[in-house]
């Protein structure tokens, strides 16, 4: 039966019926439109911590969720609000969907509501904060919910007794207050205790304001909730002073709730037992009846269940089956001719599904419509589903309005349907479970996983659901390979482990493997044949490139570098035209666009090729490319290309699905040359779909353009990276690298970015020394300046400010003022917004105080750059703009059919579209004649590229004074301010920092909170962590403990310089010793760069490994140069071989290991265990 998920706005005192204690600081609620539209913000700011009682004067409707005692409007605690997507639906369909939602809401009296927050200070993700038992549903006609419902909205008020109906509430606000008062970092606590209840695998249900979930899903969520509550109890045991923050009337926010914290675990167990023990046999019956046209289906079902229980349910089911089989009405049960006629109108397979399957499944009529839609579109085969219902898990397609059916749901439904005949060892069930695991890994970016990954995931699943052991799971997979292989491809891979050879198995979804095969076949086909015969004169090409570089050497670039850059560009043009497939890679400013323009001109002028396509992953990048190409070709997004060229095979309105299986050879596109720009952003499915549409016989050139060091795509896989690695092995001349930056302002920026690449130690130290050359102190803060002489003028190109006084906002304002002053202006909006010359970048959207969400609200509401007369307007309007000030915004969804106004051609363009990543600024429409009154006061966005305007849909836009680094990929900005808050070490990767730094074209200002190491030290690699097997590029090093290989990756995913260091890292991991490789902060403190820093029982131990003592120069450097520096800094030096139980460790310890030690890894393990004991 149905339960509720409901979104509530973050409240800094636990929704205790009071105004937030710090309303100005707590801005997480402001993304909820009513905070602005009701204009209650000022009330909150002026009345912090005021008791709301029954007052309606509050910004967020949910401030009273856990308020003590009764509240207004019949004890309503929070609203349940559902929005119906109107896209591609007529008014009748919308009315029916709304009616079904209203009917389903009747079913949740006495059921349970899971409460969650969206924007919050705890996590980048949505977080569950509690669960309550629903006592009553208040009708939407009540004034509290609004008498006048919007045409696509259904609203109800939820009532529960705060004394008796709270199943659990997680004390997150109390935890933050505890950390603040104890001067503790919450990130440190979270390293030890798993306290944050992120929605994780359940994310599909946590969309919009409210959603319904089945008992089965509710049970899974509650089981995770039980783990979190028990973890909080462990935390309480070790931090007993935390309890007063829960129950002490003087400091606790909601002691009337939290005094029962000890009972929460038992509450959850009781609810789980209740939901698992539900006796409903046909919970899908009301959905089937509503689908067939019985508008009061849910009400009838509830009434029969209340009055007669299982017997009433059985009566309704039998009456339905009898009426359908005999084609005869039964008005006693509401089964009219209309119901029977609609059933007859269905295809036979769907009738069978409705009668004998759907009645057991907890599916709404809306979901049945979606299943029918996918059946009619031939996404799924109902004949096969009737034979094997688990296909619903494997084949149903998901979109924004339809969550796929997960294994746990369908499996519980099948147990209900089959009863004693249920077989947990069915190969079809096992296959569906395997597919489910692979789909969840796919959502994390992994296209391929090993048996180890499979086991790790399997063992986290609920054993009561899985019903079989992992060994049984593998045995069934092996025994029924023919059945498994219909949906999953299993590859055996040979791995060399020292002198031994091991066989590992890799698992990939069949659909993903098909995309990989398309890519592999394309690459290998083009490699086997020669490119068109073209007479290339390198000297002429070089001159052509010189002219394109404006026939002059850029200021700040010396002659030797300039000529070398031209050599590289010339070589790139020649090699890319000599190979049918190639890669052009390099950071911004190295001339990639110049090379591509030259290649396209030669393709046209010399080879006569006209069908040249440039495709990009985002609309923004397509617009930027078009601006640079001067009509040589029209760039468009991959999505638009597919939608336009293959509209007969493309489902683009509700699903992004291209029916490649139906595109025959003749239907494929004849293209002379395909250039894919920003290739690092293209995921495996998009790349596979694209290449699957092209007739390879006609394709003369395929060129991938991008920066190989950037972040992997948001979607699954890393095809650009895998193709690069493959070509590097089989055809290295087809890879063209541009390394010399020809923008003088960018040169130092690119050099700094190399800190996050795999460069040697000497180059790293050279860059660091350049950085430390101009170090200053400003109060408590440290400032590092990197300058460049450009045209005889010394310019500050990079500023790195380490903020130790805690005032990031002040430092941000100072950074903005510095950049404005350098550009001879004081007008922030003219410079940063209207002309897009300044961009703030941050790693996260909502995590912590300085995600893009909070920075954006600070800029528009509090910063010194808002003129006083505009402050109220900026505060009261979520998006605002006029000629003086405006909100900078970014489009976050593709809208292919959006009409826009072309400001250059001064005309409306039908279905031009606006695309994810496009940026611009808002302004409020003012009517200038009576015909435009309906648009008055609507917000319009003026986009930068192309120069178009469009009316906004607020759900498709976000503020963009600050954006996340991920959103910045594919864009460049003249001036960049990068903010790196503390506590994000596990989140920020090398690729993320590299991408952020290289977004800056002329000026970079980095603001680092607390310590420089928060910026410089990261061993995390998103590319290394992502598991793929495209072109057999699966990285096996994390599976096998010790593999001798240059630049090897450890079990933890970081690259080390030698196999011996990898051995040590993996041994540390094996015994549970935390370590960091090549910790730059130690270099900053002592002047040498140790191989490892260990953390054992809060004792810091440095580690140097001597791997080449047979080399005299190496030995001398270690003994005569490095060791004295350690001694000067007070380090006691101990050899690993000398450690025993009697060894005494001082405060500063350096351990030295040698190659000799690693000849016996078992002995090293024992030494490490001894080290743990004596520390």
UniProtKB/Swiss-Prot annotation:
Tell me which InterPro entries the record gives.
Coronavir_polyprotein_1ab, P-loop_NTPase, RecD2-like_HHH, UvrD-like_helicase_C
Protein name (Swiss-Prot/TrEMBL): Uncharacterized protein MJ1519
Q: What are the disulfide bonds?
A: none
Entry-linked SUPFAM superfamilies: P-loop containing nucleoside triphosphate hydrolases
The record's PANTHER family line, in alphabetical order, gives: DNA HELICASE B, DNA2/NAM7 HELICASE FAMILY MEMBER
Q: Which UniProt keywords apply?
A: ATP-binding, Nucleotide-binding
Residues that hold ATP according to the record = 586-593
Gene Ontology MF terms in the entry: ATP binding; DNA helicase activity
Q: Which organism is it from?
A: Methanocaldococcus jannaschii (strain ATCC 43067 / DSM 2661 / JAL-1 / JCM 10045 / NBRC 100440) (Methanococcus jannaschii)
